[in-house]
């Protein structure tokens, strides 16, 4: 049975997240319905990252097995035809070995969090960025972010309902970059805890606003207590950019 790797882009706003839910619309559910319409069989679509409600993707990766063989480009086109009207696009498909697993074969996941730092309201990017009206010291944010690099117990920065067996993760990259009013927080790691990226972003915004210092961020990390975390950033600005294998 051929296995196909999909690279997918989506707007997370109308979905309850990636993961299939009984009633609410999910990205996984939309793709599985498209696969059923394409090949006439129930197919499970496995994603590399289980993004939360409202979180977007530029390069989510998934795999699926289909009994009927398809040319990769024809499968892509058929899935795109059937996934409408959802804001989901299958960017590419390729045949991969049976040993490939979208989630477990991944060696690194890259996320970007987009902030617009201005007092004026959003007009064109509502639901796509987090508008922070108070001026942010992005140099201070970047310096503080380096406290979180490396292997740590990230209990402070994970959701209380996170089901991961261990709170330890290794963060490879956490950069804060400004271009005019736009502030990007870029992070890379093999894997993350539930709500970890948004929790780190919210705490870094407190640093940028002058509410916290780098030492305060370090103390929050060391506390290993969820209540020590700063605010959790909204999902609007978070994008799964790329998955490495």
From Swiss-Prot:
Q: Does the keyword Phosphoprotein apply?
A: no
User: Which InterPro entries does the UniProt entry name for this protein?
Assistant: PsdUridine_synth_cat_dom_sf, PsdUridine_synth_TruA, PsdUridine_synth_TruA_a/b_dom, PsdUridine_synth_TruA_C, TruA/RsuA/RluB/E/F_N
**GO BP, sorted A to Z:** tRNA pseudouridine synthesis
List its EC numbers: 5.4.99.12
Can you state which reaction this protein catalyses? uridine(38/39/40) in tRNA = pseudouridine(38/39/40) in tRNA
Residues given in the record as substrate binding sites:
111
Instruction: Please report the name of this protein according to its UniProt entry.
Output: tRNA pseudouridine synthase A
Name the species this protein comes from.
Rhodopseudomonas palustris (strain BisB5)
- Higher taxonomy: Bacteria, Pseudomonadati, Pseudomonadota, Alphaproteobacteria, Hyphomicrobiales
């Amino acid at each position: 049975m051929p296995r196909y790797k999909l690279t997918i882009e989506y707007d997370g706003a109308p979905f309850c997240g990636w993961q299939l839910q009984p009633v609410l619309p999910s990205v996984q559910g939309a793709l599985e319905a498209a696969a059923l319409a394409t090949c006439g069989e129930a197919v499970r679509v496995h994603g590399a990252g289980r993004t939360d409600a409202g979180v977007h993707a530029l390069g989510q990766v998934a795999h699926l097995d289909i009994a009927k063989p398809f040319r990769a480009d024809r499968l892509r086109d058929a899935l795109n035809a059937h996934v409408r009207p959802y804001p989901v696009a299958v960017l590419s498909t390729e045949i991969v070995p049976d040993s490939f697993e979208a989630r477990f074969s991944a060696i690194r996941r890259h996320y970007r969090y987009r902030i617009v730092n201005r007092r004026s309201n959003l007009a064109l990017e509502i639901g796509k960025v987090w508008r922070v009206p108070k001026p942010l010291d992005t140099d201070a944010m970047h310096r503080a972010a380096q406290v979180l690099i490396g292997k740590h117990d990230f209990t402070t920065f994970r959701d209380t309902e996170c089901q991961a067996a261990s709170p330890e993760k290794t963060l490879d990259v956490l950069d804060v970059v400004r271009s005019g009013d736009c502030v990007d927080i870029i992070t890379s790691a093999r894997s993350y805890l539930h709500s970890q990226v948004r929790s780190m972003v919210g705490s870094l915004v407190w640093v940028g606003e002058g509410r916290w210092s780098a030492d305060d961020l370090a103390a929050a990390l060391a506390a290993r207590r969820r209540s020590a975390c700063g605010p959790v950033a909204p999902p609007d600005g978070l994008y799964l950019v790329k998955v490495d294998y």
